[in-house]
Amino acid sequence: NYITFAFLSLLILLASSCSKESFDFSSIHARFFYDNSIHQDATLQSALNPMSPGVFCRIYEGNEGSSLFFYFESNQNMKTKQKATADDLRPTRILGILPKTGIIVGYGNLSYPATLYCYDSQCPNCYAETNMANYKLTIASNGIASCTKCKREYDLNNNGLCANGKKLIKYRATCTGPLGVLSVNN
């Protein structure tokens, strides 16, 4: 009897812990921690404000000389860059499938309270077909991300959905406010 009770209890616990949301995120690793209270980057700040949903920011990294920079581009035509500090370099960074194209973060405008989304900046359909990370999405002011190769469009405000293919690769993200810490940890 005790073994049956323990087994049923475990089964109920496991069944209740597997929410639909837990399957919504990619199994691809992504890791990024950025303290915007130190950098005060206006482009990132605009995307991390839940009171201005629909603003999205691409974050990617690149080198200028021997220095690493983080680049921020919003769908509202803002572009900034910040030189990485020693504290930025300490934790392991995995900015999506390809760090040179990065991730896209922002609050969707279709729910209240607004939902923070974090997507890979690669077209998931082209990436799945070729297994190559050569398909950086463009992001428009209306919150639509487009692939120039396959012409598919993805709704950044609506969980990265696509009318005719896979939805965007989605990562877990939290933030403590526009001038707080952005944490992507998948």
Where are the language model's segments positioned?
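Bacterial N-terminal signal peptides that target proteins for export
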Residues: 1-6
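Residue-level signal for mature regions of secreted extracellular proteins and peptides
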Residues: 11, 116, 140-143
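C-terminal motif of bacterial Sec signal peptides marking the signal peptidase cleavage site
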Residues: 13-17
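Bacterial signal peptide processing site
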Residues: 18-22
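N-terminal pre-ligand scaffold of iron-sulfur
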Residues: 23-137, 170-186
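Short Cys/His-rich metal-coordination motifs, predominantly Zn2+-binding knuckles/fingers
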Residues: 126, 150-151
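Iron-sulfur (Fe-S) cluster-binding segments and ferredoxin-like electron-carrier domains
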Residues: 132, 154-159
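Short cysteine/histidine-rich metal-coordination sites, predominantly Zn2+-binding motifs
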Residues: 138-150, 161-176
